[in-house]
């Protein structure tokens, strides 16, 4: 929450205030998406969840692009494809971590990405890491620890708990790094591309990327599972739209510090 407050205080224009609101809505949407994915964890292959999510996103995004009369292909197609690859791989890593780890552990690992985003934006885009943003990120980390209270760090007696699976932790951290790089690419693309075009390239890459992973493993979902899958698709789509809107108006480090509010939503 401290990251949220400091980011909002730094917003001077109406556009920036609107971007802050969009990012808060983004955090809420991604929290609801996480609940849906966690409910499906272990019941369906991760690649199948990503595939269905991507198909829903393509249908919705194409309809919205047609409505506003914008071509889906964009101008910076190379970077748009890179954004799609980064986002797809990050999503696969995060969903797999959710399936293998406790929710608190997976969330905590994922929320290393604001720090990684600030560093990546500084290295790749030359965006400065202002002191108040650095403080916001640090306070956000403390807030994550206090809110999630991961019991895998220390038990009530002070004894260190058994280690988490190394592969699952690697997937969680890898997903966070790829998420950070994807957000930096969105920030770069937003200067010239329509937000819906940026959103469109995510599922455009995800669909062909996940199909081979389902060879011989696909499971036809039950009616209840279809409801959760639709929830994943709709909430992720809303989150991506609001995320792109927020990153188009705010520096990457400030924008991602606002997303710490997702931890609050996740704890409710």
Place the predicted regions along the sequence by residue.
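Hydrophobic/small/kink-forming positions within alpha-helical transmembrane segments
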Residues: 27-35, 62, 84, 88-92, ...
């Amino acid at each position: 929450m401290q990251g949220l407050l400091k980011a909002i205080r730094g917003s001077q224009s109406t556009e920036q205030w609107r971007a802050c609101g969009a990012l808060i809505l983004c955090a809420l949407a991604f929290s609801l998406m996480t609940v849906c994915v966690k409910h499906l964890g272990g019941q369906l292959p991760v690649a199948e969840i990503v595939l269905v999510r991507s198909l829903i996103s393509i249908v919705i995004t194409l309809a919205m692009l047609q409505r506003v009369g914008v071509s889906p292909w964009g101008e910076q197609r190379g970077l748009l494809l890179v954004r799609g690859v980064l986002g797809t791989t990050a999503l696969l890593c995060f969903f797999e971590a959710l399936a293998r780890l406790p929710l608190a552990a997976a969330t905590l690992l994922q929320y290393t990405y604001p720090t990684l985003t600030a560093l990546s934006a500084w290295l790749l885009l030359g965006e400065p890491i202002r002191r108040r943003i650095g403080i916001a990120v640090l306070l956000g980390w403390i807030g994550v620890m206090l809110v999630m209270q991961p019991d895998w760090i220390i038990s009530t007696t002070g004894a260190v708990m058994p280690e988490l699976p190394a592969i699952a932790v690697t997937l969680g951290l890898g997903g966070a790094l790829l998420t950070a790089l994807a957000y930096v690419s969105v920030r770069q693309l937003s200067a010239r591309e329509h937000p819906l075009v940026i959103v469109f390239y995510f599922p455009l890459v995800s669909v062909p990327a996940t199909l081979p992973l389902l060879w011989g493993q696909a499971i036809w979902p039950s009616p209840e599972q279809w409801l959760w899958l639709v929830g994943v698709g709709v909430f992720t789509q809303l989150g991506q739209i609001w995320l792109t809107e927020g990153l188009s108006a705010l520096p990457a480090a400030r924008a991602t510090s606002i997303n710490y509010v997702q931890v609050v939503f996740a704890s409710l």
